């Protein structure tokens, strides 16, 4: 059984942190901050084994849609062409696009220099659980704790050998 830990941090402008960069790191992916033009690359993070975005009921529908033009552009990309599983690559692209859109919309809304843009929660998972048990437990926990209370949740499971955690 892993040693339990649960850490909560605030991601805000005042500390110079980038919510886009934090999400890219969390998801082991590439994301662009539309406000600054900065692109965050974390595609070499191999410990990301599962990622999800759970939207609350009142989240705008357009945050959940990926424009057809963006899909066509991705399907022409080297990243898509080199993918062993094209369907999985397309789903990952759509999910990353939705997350990037969510956080860029937060940045457009929260302009204050001391704005709290999001909260980061990290907790351990029992290493004895199967991947599916980890996903099921985490999904249920996040749904009840955050999404049902009107929050969106951008989360992933990281597997660092004998340390498995949700961030």
How does the language model describe each region?
Residues 1-167:
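N-terminal nicking endonuclease/strand-transfer module with a His-rich metal-binding environment
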């Amino acid at each position: 059984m892993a040693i339990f830990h649960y850490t909560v941090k605030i991601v805000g402008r005042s500390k110079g942190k980038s919510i886009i960069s934090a999400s890219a790191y969390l998801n082991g992916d590439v994301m662009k901050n539309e406000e600054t033009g900065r692109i965050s690359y974390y595609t070499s993070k191999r410990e990301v084994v599962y990622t999800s975005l759970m939207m609350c009921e009142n989240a705008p529908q357009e945050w959940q849609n990926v424009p057809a033009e963006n899909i066509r552009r991705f399907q022409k990309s080297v990243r898509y062409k080199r993918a062993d599983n094209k369907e999985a690559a397309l789903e990952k692209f759509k999910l990353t696009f939705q997350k990037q859109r969510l956080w860029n919309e937060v940045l457009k809304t929260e302009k204050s220099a001391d704005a709290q843009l999001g909260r980061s929660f990290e907790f351990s998972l029992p290493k004895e659980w199967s991947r599916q048990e980890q996903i099921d437990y985490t999904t249920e926990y996040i749904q009840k704790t955050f999404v049902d209370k009107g929050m969106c949740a951008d989360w992933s499971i990281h597997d660092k050998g004998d340390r498995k955690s949700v961030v």
